[in-house]
Amino acid sequence: MARTKQTARKSTGGKAPRKQLASKAARKSAPVSGGVKKPHRYKPGTVALREIRRFQKSTELLIRKLPFQRLVREIAQDFKSDLRFQSSAIGALQEAVEAYLVGLFEDTNLCAIHAKRVTIQKKDIQLARRLRGERS
C-alpha cells in the first residue's frame, strides 16, 4: 500500500481525544520486529465458499481410490472370504457411493437451512434419511 502525505485538518470541535493506556501506547510505539510480514488470512467462510465452487465444477472422485478399495474389501470379508473384485466394479461402487453421499449432504444442508442454521448437524442427517424413507 502506498504511503500518502498527510495534511493538517481543521478541528470540527468534537470530543477531545481520550488518553491511551500506557500498555496500548507502548504496543503502538514498539518497532516492528525485523519487518516480518504476517501471512495473509482470508475472512472466515471465504475459503469454504471457494472450495464449494471448485468441487461443484469438478467431476473427479473425491474419495481416494486405494482407501476406498480397502474399505470395500474389509466389508466384503464379513460376508464371504476370498472375494475378488474387478477394478471397474470398485470404480462403479465408488461412483455410486459418492453420488449417494453428495445427495445426502444436499438434503442435510436443506434441513439445516430450514432450521435457520448454516451448520449441518447429526440430527439433520437423521431427518434427511427419515424423509427419504431409508430408516424409520
Curated annotation (Swiss-Prot):
A GO CC term attached to the entry: nucleosome
Residues carrying N6-acetyllysine: 10, 15, 19, 24, 28, 37, 57, 65
GO molecular function terms attached to this record: DNA binding; protein heterodimerization activity; structural constituent of chromatin
Keywords recorded for this protein, A-Z: Acetylation, Chromosome, DNA-binding, Methylation, Nucleosome core, Nucleus, Phosphoprotein
Modification after translation (UniProt): Phosphorylated to form H3S10ph. H3S10ph promotes subsequent H3K14ac formation and is required for transcriptional activation through TBP recruitment to the promoters.
Keyword check for Phosphoprotein: yes
One family name in Pfam for this protein: Histone
Chain positions found as N6,N6,N6-trimethyllysine: 5, 28, 37, 80
SMART domains recorded: H3
Modified residues (N6-methyllysine): 5, 10, 19, 24, 28, 37, 80
Primary localization: nucleus
Annotated region (Disordered), positions in chain: 1-42
Modified residue annotations for N6,N6-dimethyllysine: 5, 15, 28, 37, 80
Residues with PTM Phosphoserine: 11
Listed InterPro entries: Histone-fold (IPR009072), Histone_H2A/H2B/H3 (IPR007125), Histone_H3/CENP-A (IPR000164)
Function: Core component of nucleosome. Nucleosomes wrap and compact DNA into chromatin, limiting DNA accessibility to the cellular machineries which require DNA as a template. Histones thereby play a central role in transcription regulation, DNA repair, DNA replication and chromosomal stability. DNA accessibility is regulated via a complex set of post-translational modifications of histones, also called histone code, and nucleosome remodeling.
Assembly with partners or alone: The nucleosome is a histone octamer containing two molecules each of H2A, H2B, H3 and H4 assembled in one H3-H4 heterotetramer and two H2A-H2B heterodimers. The octamer wraps approximately 147 bp of DNA.
UniProt name for this protein: Histone H3.3
Native organism: Lodderomyces elongisporus (strain ATCC 11503 / CBS 2605 / JCM 1781 / NBRC 1676 / NRRL YB-4239)
